[in-house]
């Protein structure tokens, strides 16, 4: 039986760019403390001293309200802006500080200290690969189109609401992989075999599994008290689709306790697919 949340803690992700780096690292660390309820604040593009001072005001307000020090993850390059943030009543966890100095010492060259470089669009081919992959994922979502499956790097399959769409989008956005996804319906499962449109692309298929209890909860958000969201229906579909995975020799993964990031990384590992970007 899981423990209940113990208390709430304010967290700030601060950056002179998109804040994606600070947020990604911060969430990975915070996930190790499931009994703490975190109140997340994302502060991107903090590039001036004025903006930094405004953030300090917000941090201090949270400290007064919560009665404990907020946690601050930042990827600020400008030392003047960083010094201002460090005056806040908070626990400052500078993502770059320490790492940059160690790299500078090892590489024998000073850093550029250019702000916002992490996600700058500097390589047009890199950018195009990302955008093309995202467009492909959107155009080939949920079995809407199947005629371009020959161009897919990967085709995710699973029952309805098992995480196919968000995983497809993440793989395309983060790694530039062309991903289609196809839901196996009750009719497909009754046949106890892959639909014809998928059989010719068997080598590209990867299955998602999820525990019945979790699937019930997800489906109930859309259609509460329906047959679609009932435990018996979810259990029946999951047993049937796992049988297809096994009989057809399709690799699959139970994603119940996994984040999208974990799911995507495991899929790359299990399939041997190479990222096009990142």
UniProtKB/Swiss-Prot annotation:
This is Putative phosphoenolpyruvate synthase regulatory protein. Keywords: Kinase, Nucleotide-binding, Serine/threonine-protein kinase, Transferase. It catalyses: [pyruvate, water dikinase] + ADP = [pyruvate, water dikinase]-phosphate + AMP + H(+); [pyruvate, water dikinase]-phosphate + phosphate + H(+) = [pyruvate, water dikinase] + diphosphate. It is an enzyme of class 2 (transferase). GO terms for molecular function: ADP binding; ATP binding; phosphotransferase activity, phosphate group as acceptor; protein serine/threonine kinase activity. The keyword Nucleotide-binding applies. Bifunctional serine/threonine kinase and phosphorylase involved in the regulation of the phosphoenolpyruvate synthase (PEPS) by catalyzing its phosphorylation/dephosphorylation. Belongs to the pyruvate, phosphate/water dikinase regulatory protein family. PSRP subfamily. ADP binds at residues 158-165. NCBIfam families: PRK05339.1 (NF003742). Its EC number is 2.7.11.33, 2.7.4.28.
């Amino acid at each position: 039986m899981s423990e209940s949340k113990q208390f709430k803690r304010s967290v700030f992700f601060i950056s002179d760019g998109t804040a994606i780096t600070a947020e990604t690292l911060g969430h990975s660390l915070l996930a190790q403390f499931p009994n703490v309820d975190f109140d997340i604040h994302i502060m991107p593009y903090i590039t001036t001293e004025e903006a930094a001072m405004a953030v300090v005001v917000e941090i201090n307000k949270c400290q007064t309200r919560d009665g404990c020090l907020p946690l601050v993850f930042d990827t600020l390059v400008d030392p003047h802006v960083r010094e201002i943030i460090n005056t806040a009543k908070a626990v400052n966890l500078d993502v770059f500080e320490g790492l940059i100095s160690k790299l500078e010492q090892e590489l024998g060259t000073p850093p550029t200290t250019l702000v916002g470089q992490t996600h700058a669009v500097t390589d047009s081919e890199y950018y195009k690969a990302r955008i093309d992959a995202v467009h492909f994922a959107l155009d080939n979502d949920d079995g809407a189109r199947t005629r371009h499956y020959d161009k897919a790097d990967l085709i995710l399959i699973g029952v309805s609401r098992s995480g196919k769409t968000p995983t497809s989008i993440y793989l395309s956005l983060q790694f530039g992989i062309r991903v289609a996804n196809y839901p196996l319906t009750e009719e497909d499962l009754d046949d106890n075999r892959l639909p014809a449109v998928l059989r010719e692309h068997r080598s590209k298929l990867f299955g998602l599994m999820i525990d019945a209890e979790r699937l019930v909860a997800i489906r109930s958000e859309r259609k509460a008290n329906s047959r679609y969201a009932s435990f018996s229906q979810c259990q029946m579909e999951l047993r049937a689709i796992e049988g297809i995975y096994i009989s057809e020799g399709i690799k699959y993964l139970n994603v119940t306790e996994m984040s999208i990031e974990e799911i995507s990384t495991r899929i790359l590992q299990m399939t041997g697919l190479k990222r096009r970007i990142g």
